Amino acid sequence: MKAIYLVIILTFPLHADKIRDFWFNGAEISSFTLSQSRYGKNHPGHAELIFVTEPFLSGKQVKDESGKGDSTDVLKLNSLTTFNTGIYSYHTMTSTFRPTDLEKFPHALKSTTSIQDWCGQAFQQFNFRKNGWNIQVRSYFENVGDKDLVLPSAHLEDEVWITLRLDPKKLPIGETEIIPGAIFTRFNHQPIAAVKANAAFSESGGNRIYTLTYPSLGRILAIHFDTVFPHIIRKWEETTKTGTTTATLNKRMMNVPYWELNKPEDAEKRKEIGLDPVAN
């Protein structure tokens, strides 16, 4: 029993050290070739996943820039997609803030999403509080409008991507309730609510696949990632009743202080991550 107890005690610091050694040295930027299903057709585009750690005030739920207050380290994911549907363009972005201490914090603290196209824009924000998820929705469109609501604690699909990178063993497995991704709910005019899903792991081509199946939505999300830490995301597939969206890893850069690369000559760096010099 003493030996087993010692192994358990040592496991957590070792994994925490791995997280700190890898993730606290600048951002990871990955570009993906996107085929986005929209309006029953597939449209070419690109996607970026930007993972970076930063100090975060767990009370105010904003970046800790003063060095005062209840600060905790989070792994932030900025997930972006860009694609055109015929003549007009779409831009989406989701920012999710997940504490690296998975034992102390059961969920992300915050997740925000914005969608812009030529018709208008929409925004929603999730804040995790003692009473569950506090949600704000703001939209140009009448059938969505402006609303505030509270949902009981449940896993966010948008936090799954970060948990997967930190420790896949912490992901929900089997039948569970998950709040689907914000982009999906907005694109498909779905109510914001926890939905029954089946979560499972599988393997293919030396990689692991984490799959979320939502029977009531007719939707499957499959994320392909490396078996070993840091569990690099290689591709994802989202299948719905109207089509399948795929994103495949193009290029990846580590230890990038992108917030400092803001001069005209730094645009050359965009080529290194597979992006055009001028954003589109």
What do these predicted ranges mean?
Residues 3-12:
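Sec-dependent N-terminal signal peptides
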Residues 17-132, 169-280:
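Acidic, serine/threonine-rich low-complexity disordered tracts
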Residues 125-176:
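Surface-exposed beta-loop interaction hotspot
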